[in-house]
Amino acid sequence: MHRCMPLVAASMAALMLAGCGGGDGDTTLSTAAATDTTTLKTAATTSISPLWLTIAKDSAAFTVSGTRTVRYGAGSAWVAKSMSGTGQCTAAFFGKDPAAGVAKVCQVAQGTGTLLWRGVSLAGAEFGEGSLPGTYGSNYIYPSADSATYYKNKGMNLVRLPFRWERLQPTLNQALDANELSRLTGFVNAVTAAGQTVLLDPHNYARYYGNVIGSSAVPNSAYADFWRRVATQFKGNARVIFGLMNEPNSMPTEQWLSGANAALAAIRSANASNVVFVPGNAWTGAHSWNQNWYGTPNGTVMKGINDPGRNLVFEVHQYLDGDSSGQSASCVSATIGAERLQDFTNWLRSNGYRGFLGEFGAASNDTCNQAVANMLTFVKNNADVWTGWAWWAGGPWWGGYMYSIEPSNGVDKPQMSVLAPYLK
């Protein structure tokens, strides 16, 4: 799951997307059509793990409609009760203080059947991989809050924000860079204040200056330190989701699991209660989740994930071209998107997890437009395990990139008309 396109803009023609290169290596995918590619027909059902969204801060009043399960606490320490009507986010109301001396929140368990998030990746802050850390405004750029507003007005309630770990933390186990943190928090604060959710995406492919997480150069403890610092910065914002990493690849799946669990432990030790999105190995491809060409399958290893806060979603990426790399203007068939999601959907339901389609995209042509529509219909029809999706991509420096939906001089890109029915 990997896409690589030149960034074409008047002053930025020399830039290339961070991480450009070889695709996910699987070119022998079956494209046999299912009987019905927009609904799921197989997989044994188990209880789906709840997803928790914050509804009140410590000491605040809140109201729930109907009878709901609400929990009170922080990080990995919680007490829960079934209730209706009005409550107080206090130890007195819940009968126990699960985390003494720590600022707590109240979260409500989200039901299944409705997609929570629909949005877009706004690229730019991850650009300039060959110029790390690079010069802001020359090698990379953060999108503007106005750009996010355009997508909000289209009905998108989530922005995925790619950025580079090396810029935010220039030295492992040391403080976050003040200037980069200011850019990041400025965007996050403006966009979340306007009502959208921001998915933070360290766009590093499980690497730091080219060294893989879990190696002697980048031990799991350093990765955990990074996430502890980021979680501490954003734990007070209920509209921030932590995406652990963009597209881990070319490493043992077990090694990635170890790093992911270290990051989750660090996030919860910082008393952050935010939702966390967890990718798999092999560019986190949905189509290859249970395949073994990259080593032990994600579908086997990632069942060992351990979130002390019990508030995670598995993030997968899925493109529609022949090798699922997202580097072609063609799509295999009108049904290929739904077909490639089905096995992962079965896995989610069989194991009680929830998923998010963190990247997908296509050029605008008849086959691809129908493939995108069928894929999104499939996700919508399986919302008991799917939580939403984010298109790849928007952002200010794309120029003529074939998957971009960034408007040009105020004019919508053609793909927006395909997405529009799914934003209502």
From Swiss-Prot:
- Share an example GO biological-process annotation for this protein: cellulose catabolic process
Q: Where is the active site?
A: 247 (proton donor), 359 (nucleophile)
- Family recorded in the similarity comment: Belongs to the glycosyl hydrolase 5 (cellulase A) family.
Query: Which terms are listed as keywords in the entry?
Result: Carbohydrate metabolism, Cell membrane, Cellulose degradation, Glycosidase, Hydrolase, Lipoprotein, Membrane, Palmitate, Plasmid, Polysaccharide degradation, Signal, Zymogen
Catalytic activity reads: Endohydrolysis of (1->4)-beta-D-glucosidic linkages in cellulose, lichenin and cereal beta-D-glucans
Where mainly located?
membrane
Maturation propeptide residues = 20-43
Q: Secretion signal: which residues?
A: 1-19
N-palmitoyl cysteine lipid sites? 20
Report the EC code(s) recorded for this entry: 3.2.1.4
State the lipidation positions (S-diacylglycerol cysteine): 20
Q: Which Pfam families match?
A: Cellulase
This chain's protein is named Endoglucanase
GO MF terms here are: cellulase activity
Q: Name one GO cellular component term.
A: plasma membrane
